[in-house]
Amino acid sequence: MSLIISWDVVILNFLVFPTIFNTTNCIRFHKMGHMEINTMIGCRVDCDFCPQTLLMDKYSSLANIENISYGNPSFMSFADFKTCLDKIPKEMEVSFGGYSEAFLNPECAKMIVYTHNSGHPVEVYSTLVGMTFEDIKQIEHIPFNIFLIHLPDEPMYAKIAVNKNYIAALKELLSS
């Protein structure tokens, strides 16, 4: 698995070019198209630059769902994900990331595997919050176009708890 790890640069790139980090990707983006998957609304990572509260409010009103919050998120189901993915061309690149931490959805690894098995190029942008050892085992065989890890930063732009589980998952991912 090829990984890109960045600290401060991630935030700048995220704000300027959410999923396009170099000329090659720019060209690929324009040729094949791109679909960004947000697996949930109500991300508890609560990055300073993310409009999560606005997203929760807007999604709640549009979907007529009450009480979406950091402690009560709304997850995309695997069935809904399959319905969406099956409608886009196979050459379209699929990116997991954006306005939520994809691995907070317990079905994220299953979605990534399905995307790869469907023939789509796959990208992941993640803080790893919510990622389990089982998730790593499910996805370690996938040749990601990009797997970018947003590590904890000193100013705490993202609320990432650096504990034994987080360190162990990061080490396992890097060794896979």
Q: Residue locations for each model-derived region?
A:
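Conserved alpha-helical substructure of the radical SAM core
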Residues: 6-7, 11-147, 158-159
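Classical nucleotidyltransferase
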Residues: 149-176
